[in-house]
């Protein structure tokens, strides 16, 4: 869902379909966030070829949610309400599933009996721990399945470490990307001069005034060439010493 990548795909002839009515014929590619199972079933019923590109880590959340439902748990999804990944998870989590974004949301829920938690893959471990602490005293049984993506956790930890060593941080990635926004917030907590950009053209010289060490990292949906391409030379031309965060492998 990176805006630049979506634009490049459109230029290559791949159109973005908001729903199946926009894809009357041909092949439908399910994006990494996944969808509710009814969408895939409906696509096949219409004779469309379905290429399921759902992230394997997201599929693990679907499987975990379905297992909790079978075992009699009410499922709570820790994540961003309305986010495409979360909407897809809800399709596997039973009719009484709900979404909480933080501990305060959990406090407002009416809970009883057996509750099972799954997590949007790009959430922080800290947020999960806070939600668990809020729910635990209020239920008979709580089962937590930590479905945070390992690569996401590693990237968040590395970004925090990098931000602590830098005078300025640049986060590259879509403004609509949940995991990129979380990276930006994590970096901002450690480095006041943190800037979230989608393209190198957004860089401003004033950001790097008196900055001796400049850190750069990116969200999971940002292609490596968008970091290695125009961004690094522009930052170096501002006179800063660049520290780049290596990308952890997913899996």
Model regions and ranges:
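The feature marks the mature, well-folded catalytic cores of soluble enzymes
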Residues: 1-220, 224-251
